[in-house]
């Protein structure tokens, strides 16, 4: 990747359906960013675990962010 893409964000409701939406979002981003399949699959799993935790324990909607930082990917989930 020559240029670092902008962080990718999605707002999600505090709902069990958000876990599937997060998985699809992460899969689409990792495909667009040309990640190899094993790494992309791991990111989908990690992201869905983070969203599941927020759905279970947060009291508000949440935001999932994916960010490329040099040779690393940062996944964050914040409740509002």
Regions found by a protein language model. Give the residues of each.
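Histidine-centered phosphotransfer motif of kinases
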Residues: 42-60
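Hydrophobic packing within well-folded, soluble alpha/beta domains
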Residues: 22, 50, 75-77
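Conserved short strand/loop->alpha-helix "switch" segment adjacent to the catalytic nucleotide/phosphoryl-transfer site
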Residues: 20, 24-48
């Amino acid at each position: 990747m020559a240029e670092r893409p902008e962080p990718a964000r999605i707002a999600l409701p505090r709902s069990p359906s958000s876990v599937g939406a997060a998985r699809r979002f992460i899969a689409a981003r990792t495909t667009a960013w040309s990640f190899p399949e094993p790494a992309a699959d791991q990111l989908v799993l990690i992201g869905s675990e983070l969203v599941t935790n927020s759905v279970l324990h947060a009291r508000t909607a949440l935001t999932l962010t994916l960010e490329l930082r040099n040779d690393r990917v940062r996944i964050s989930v914040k409740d509002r």
